[in-house]
């Protein structure tokens, strides 16, 4: 396997992991709470909730000196356990009885395991109405334009991310050193610093098993992609014209208005750029 291919795989893995913890899991936990807001507001809410929860979870377990993969995973599933308990509170005996009845049906061969775990298809079809189809069709132009912005980020920054294998800023080894010290429950090892960035890198390293230097090497591109999405989504919520946010983001993406250092910093995994996400 070539180094270019390996780097692309690593970028995809880190991107998927970061998306899971900052968008998908918050969506599962908070979608009913945020249902009353617009789509851009919901996305911003999920993203902020995911990042802030992970950062403060790492702070908590680090200060308690119990940080590790197990404690972080347990801390990550606590919100879902609380939500499930509140949802099922008072109905637990009924749920147990229903499960036992289904098990009895399985033993008698009346239903299969697929029906036991996923339910009947006709009930699911009833939930998906024509209005849902029309609602999703309405967002097709936004999805296409967002995909074009993502493709633009890959075009502008992707080649450098894939073909330059080392660190791209002189202070990245120091940040790597700080993150590695957190493996020993030693936070702020080289001084007090705005540590949310380090908490996120450490979480990706500890929970998903990535080497710290790998995350530091490829997260810069993932971070840059989310920076442009963090610019696009609020504009989509604020602008009356549907296409203005995409035009504005594209102009900033392809324009050359600032010094070269402004754009070169996007190639590195740096805390200042991580702060631009918020």
For the regions a language model picked out, list residue spans one by one.
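Membrane-proximal lumenal/periplasmic loop motifs of glycosylation machinery
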Residues: 163-168, 183-198
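Membrane-embedded, hydrophobic transmembrane alpha-helices
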Residues: 1-136
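Short hydrophobic/aromatic helix or loop-helix immediately within or flanking a transmembrane segment
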Residues: 190-212
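Membrane-embedded helix bundles of polyisoprenyl
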Residues: 47-58, 146-154, 197, 219-238, ...
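Hydrophobic alpha-helical transmembrane segments
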Residues: 13-28, 162-173, 216-224
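Transmembrane signal-anchor helices characteristic of membrane glycosylation enzymes that use polyprenol
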Residues: 85, 138-168
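Transmembrane alpha-helix boundary and packing residues in multipass membrane permease domains
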Residues: 27, 58, 177, 202, ...
């Amino acid at each position: 396997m070539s180094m270019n291919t390996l780097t692309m795989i690593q970028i995809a893995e880190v991107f998927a992991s970061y998306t899971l913890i900052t968008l998908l899991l918050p969506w599962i936990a908070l979608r009913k709470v945020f249902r009353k807001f617009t789509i851009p507001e919901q996305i911003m809410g999920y993203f902020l909730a995911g990042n802030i929860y992970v950062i403060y979870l790492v702070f908590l377990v680090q200060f308690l000196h119990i940080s590790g993969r197990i404690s972080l995973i347990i801390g990550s599933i606590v919100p879902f356990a609380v939500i499930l308990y509140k949802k099922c509170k008072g109905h637990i005996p009924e749920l147990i009885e229903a499960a036992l009845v289904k098990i009895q049906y399985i033993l008698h061969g009346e239903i299969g395991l697929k029906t036991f775990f996923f339910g009947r298809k006709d009930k699911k079809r009833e939930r998906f109405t024509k209005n849902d189809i029309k609602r999703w069709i309405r967002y097709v132009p936004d999805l296409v334009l967002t995909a074009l912005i993502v493709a633009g980020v890959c075009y502008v920054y992707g080649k450098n991310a894939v073909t330059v294998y080392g660190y791209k800023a002189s202070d990245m080894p120091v940040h790597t050193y700080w993150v590695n010290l957190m493996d020993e429950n030693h936070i702020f090892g080289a001084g007090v610093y705005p540590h949310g960035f380090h908490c996120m890198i450490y979480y990706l390293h500890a929970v998903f098993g990535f080497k710290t230097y790998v995350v530091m090497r490829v997260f810069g591109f993932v971070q840059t992609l989310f920076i442009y999405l963090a610019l696009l989504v609020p504009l989509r919520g604020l602008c009356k014209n549907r296409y203005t946010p995409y035009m504005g983001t594209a102009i900033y993406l392809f324009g050359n208005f600032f010094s070269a250092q402004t754009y070169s910093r996007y190639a590195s995994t740096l805390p200042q750029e991580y702060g631009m996400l918020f």
